[in-house]
């Protein structure tokens, strides 16, 4: 069952779901709560490797990722981040989210931004039960023009679903969870896959 606006507000008030800083109640819609863009970004360095062998030996994959990903880019609140057509970038939400082990979250981009070509989450829009941290966004500009994105702008909407039971393996208790408590635009850790 997906939570409605009054349940989202109640779950926030009771601390069942935590979002920090907490968005005002005006950011809670019928079945979602708006999240804003943070100021942490990462991009791919152009032509720094001919390819990434995602199924290769861990050490080689790790070295390739180090070569192709930029260091963290922090921008000021009044500074735009330009996402050019055909470019993938990582960013974070401003808010940090904590979910209990019986609730799953779903992050969707805004229709108004999608109509300009912005994909907010290329594939991974599921926020696992037991998640805690900022949500990393996988931005892609499929439009024809560069997009100027600024910290604090509304970037997506988070909805919540109650699971049939408490998860036996919530994200915060998994040993193989690669992105626990992330607070910045963490690059891919595919090299840590089992």
Swiss-Prot record:
One of its GO terms (molecular function) is nucleotide binding. InterPro entries: dCTP_deaminase, dUTPase-like_sf, dUTPase_trimeric. The active site is at residue 138. Pfam families: DCD. It catalyses: dCTP + H2O + H(+) = dUTP + NH4(+). It comes from the Bacteria. Its EC number is 3.5.4.13. Pathway: Pyrimidine metabolism; dUMP biosynthesis; dUMP from dCTP (dUTP route): step 1/2. Homotrimer. Catalyzes the deamination of dCTP to dUTP. This is dCTP deaminase. The lineage of its organism: Bacteria, Pseudomonadati, Pseudomonadota, Gammaproteobacteria, Pasteurellales.
């Amino acid at each position: 069952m997906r939570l409605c606006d009054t349940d989202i507000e109640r779950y926030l008030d009771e601390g069942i779901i935590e979002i920090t800083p907490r968005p005002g109640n005006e950011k809670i819609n019928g079945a979602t709560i708006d999240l804003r863009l943070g100021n942490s970004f990462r991009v791919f360095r152009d032509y720094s490797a001919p390819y990434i062998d995602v199924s290769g030996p861990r050490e080689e994959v790790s070295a390739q990722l180090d070569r192709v990903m930029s260091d963290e880019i922090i921008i000021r609140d009044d500074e735009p981040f330009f996402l050019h057509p055909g470019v993938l970038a990582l960013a974070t939400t401003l808010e940090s989210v904590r979910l209990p082990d019986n609730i799953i979250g779903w992050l969707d981009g805004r229709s108004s931004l999608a109509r300009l070509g912005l994909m907010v989450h290329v594939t991974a829009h599921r926020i696992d039960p037991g998640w805690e941290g900022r949500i990393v966004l996988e931005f892609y500009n499929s439009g024809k023009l560069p997009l100027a994105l600024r910290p604090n702008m509304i970037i997506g909407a988070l909805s919540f679903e109650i699971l049939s039971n408490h998860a036996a393996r919530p994200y915060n208790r998994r040993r193989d969870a690669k992105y626990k408590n992330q607070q910045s635009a963490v690059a891919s850790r595919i090299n840590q896959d089992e």
